[in-house]
Design a protein with these regions (language model features):
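Catalytic cores of nucleotide-sugar-dependent glycosyltransferases that transfer UDP/GDP/TDP-activated
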Residues: 1-158
């Protein structure tokens, strides 16, 4: 089963509360079950970008519209690659990479709407058609809406 997991935090990369712990344990546990292939998507926050222990490689980039703004979307993959669990980061300095905070900015709604739409665009770019789209907390809540509105024909089984 192909499972795309979308969250705003996951230990050890970034953790502000219990969600970070869950998102460290759950993808790892699911990846150990026979037949599962997991992709975890996280924002590429400044603290992740600046952590020398986290090594990534860019696997793609493109532009994406969000309302009135045309925005860069970078897709980075955690190195080294693992067979059944891939960790991807959505890179955009305006929304994530230049800020020292994870939450609490005046434009969090816009930031995470961008993140949700960028995850769907990244899944399409990577041609990873999930059987399950597992979205965690409000920051990822718009991802299924973008799936239905923009990517249903590409991925109707999800």
């Amino acid at each position: 089963m192909r499972i795309a997991m979308v969250a705003s935090e996951a230990a050890p990369f970034v953790k502000t509360g219990g969600l970070g712990d869950v998102m460290q344990a759950l993808p790892n546990a699911l990846s150990k079950l026979k037949g599962n292939e997991i992709c975890l998507f996280l924002p590429y926050y400044k603290r992740i970008k600046e952590d020398p222990a986290i090594e990534t490689e860019q696997v793609g980039s493109f532009s994406m519209e969000l309302a009135w703004r045309e925005s860069y979307v970078g897709i980075l993959r955690l190195k080294p690659r693992r067979k059944k669990l891939q960790v991807y980061f959505i890179d955009n300095d305006y929304y994530f990479g230049a800020r020292s905070t994870v939450y609490g900015d005046f434009d969090d709604g816009e930031r995470f709407a961008y993140f949700s739409k960028a995850v769907m665009a990244a899944l399409y770019f990577l041609d990873f058609k999930p059987d399950i789209l597992h979205c965690h907390d409000w920051q990822a809540a718009m991802t299924p809406a973008y799936l239905r509105a923009l990517y249903h024909d590409w991925c109707p089984q999800t």
